Amino acid sequence: MLRDGRPTRVDALSELEQVTFPPPVGALEAFHTGGGISILPWAYEGKVRTMEYKTLRYPGHVAVMRPIRELGLLDVTPVKVKGKEVVPRDLFIAAVSPKLTKPEGRDLVALRVDVRGHNGQGAAWQLLDYYDEARGISAMMRTTGYSLAVTGLMQVEGRIAVQGVRTPDEAVPFADYVAELGKRGVEIRELT
């Protein structure tokens, strides 16, 4: 993340806030997690004052996950259990995954981007996507897979003119990208 124009690290699950989406989603908790904006803090160092990425989950998630982390159950350093080395995180995931994974589970993806300029004016975009019942495709598969497919399509069609190694924000024409996702039912809407 960027704070005062400088890359900064903060603890995961910190700076909890509420973000509200239209029904049926409603209020979600937003909190810091790692990796979401990848190299952007270094690319925009000194150019952007503040840049944050927060994960969204249903209310109560942080209250459950903080003690799990504080107890060391997410640590990756092996510990000895009955003479065998065990990675706490691996054990935790193996133990809870079967209880959290439901065959009838239907996911959703909720995303919001808020931008504010030096002049105080801003813009915001929102994406809400749901499990595709007809095709049996999760919202996460739709939003990630279609995004990659659309980017590849735009490259093949010559709509991405930039060559070489670039980040998507540098290379992919935003309006075309949003329109192509919309054709596939993944709608990014500008909020007013």
Regions found by a protein language model. Give the residues of each.
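C-terminal catalytic/substrate-binding lobe primarily of soluble NAD(P)-dependent oxidoreductases
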Residues: 1-192
